[in-house]
């Protein structure tokens, strides 16, 4: 798709950074015209990244899959929007076209979907992982820092399958971050313990990416139309 639309060079220039100060990456990327977008979970992190010259901020809000913050998108996006002039991308529980439309209505430039695309035919994920996403709901998400030292959202059944009690997980030492293992467990984060956002209640199948994108576009159009109708009434 990227090659057919001549977007290869565009996407090569987009760099996403996370979990460490992006200054070095910004300097390197800007030397050849690249753009850097940095993951943040609060205003303090956002201001630090902005001061380092990032081109955009990815607001990883409550309910996002994997490493995620705990702030409402309403609070974080609107506050960041009040002082940041760069690109703002919203992440967290965005699983359909209605969610995308809501993100843009709130003031985001782009909506960031992650978990929903894991449950697609092309995704390089275990079939069991995809099926677990289809069968689970928001009630099956556990927010813990045990597995990497950083708080994140994970699928409860995958934690149970690793022999752990998802309702009684200890708290890890966040100063000992380890993104390649399971932290204080024998299970490995991402390999055995699967990340997921809270929006999985909307996942009912694993279509092709093309089918999913078409569906998102249709839902986005429906949501926009409904919003415009309600706005006229108000």
List where the protein language model places each region.
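Short beta-strand/loop segments at the ligand-binding rim of alpha/beta enzyme cores
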Residues: 27-41, 83-91
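Conserved active-site-proximal phosphate/metal-binding subdomains
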Residues: 75-89, 95-234
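Glycine/Thr-rich beta-alpha phosphate-binding loop at enzyme active sites
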Residues: 39-78, 120, 125
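Hydrophobic residues within beta-strands of alpha/beta enzymes
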Residues: 15, 57-58, 88, 111
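Glycine- and other small-residue-rich loops at beta-strand/loop junctions that grip anionic moieties
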Residues: 15-18, 38-39, 65-69, 89-93, ...
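Catalytic beta/alpha-barrel core
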Residues: 12-21, 35-42, 58-60
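Single conserved hydrophobic/aromatic residue that forms the stacking wall/gate
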Residues: 1-11
């Amino acid at each position: 798709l990227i090659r057919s639309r001549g977007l290869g060079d565009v996407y090569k220039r987009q760099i996403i950074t996370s979990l460490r100060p992006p200054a070095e990456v910004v300097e390197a990327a800007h030397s050849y015209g690249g753009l850097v977008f940095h993951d943040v979970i609060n205003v303090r992190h956002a201001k630090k990244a902005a001061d380092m010259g990032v081109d955009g901020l990815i607001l990883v809000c409550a309910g996002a899959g994997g490493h995620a913050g705990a702030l409402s998108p309403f609070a974080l996006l609107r506050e960041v929007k009040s002082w940041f002039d760069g690109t703002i991308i919203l992440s967290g529980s965005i699983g359909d076209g209605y969610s995308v439309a809501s993100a843009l209505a709130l003031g985001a430039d782009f909506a960031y979907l992650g978990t929903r695309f894991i449950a697609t035919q092309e995704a390089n994920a275990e079939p069991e992982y995809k099926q677990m996403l289809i069968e689970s709901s928001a009630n099956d998400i556990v927010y813990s820092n045990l597995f990497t030292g950083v708080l994140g959202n994970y699928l409860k059944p995958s934690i149970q399958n690793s022999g752990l009690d998802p309702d009684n997980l200890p708290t890890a030492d966040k100063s000992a971050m380890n993104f390649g293992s399971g932290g204080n467990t024998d299970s490995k984060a991402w390999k055995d313990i699967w990340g997921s956002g809270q929006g999985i209640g909307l996942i009912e199948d694993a279509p092709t990416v093309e089918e999913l994108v078409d569906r998102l576009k249709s839902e986005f159009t429906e949501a926009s139309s409904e919003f415009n109708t309600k706005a006229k009434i108000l």
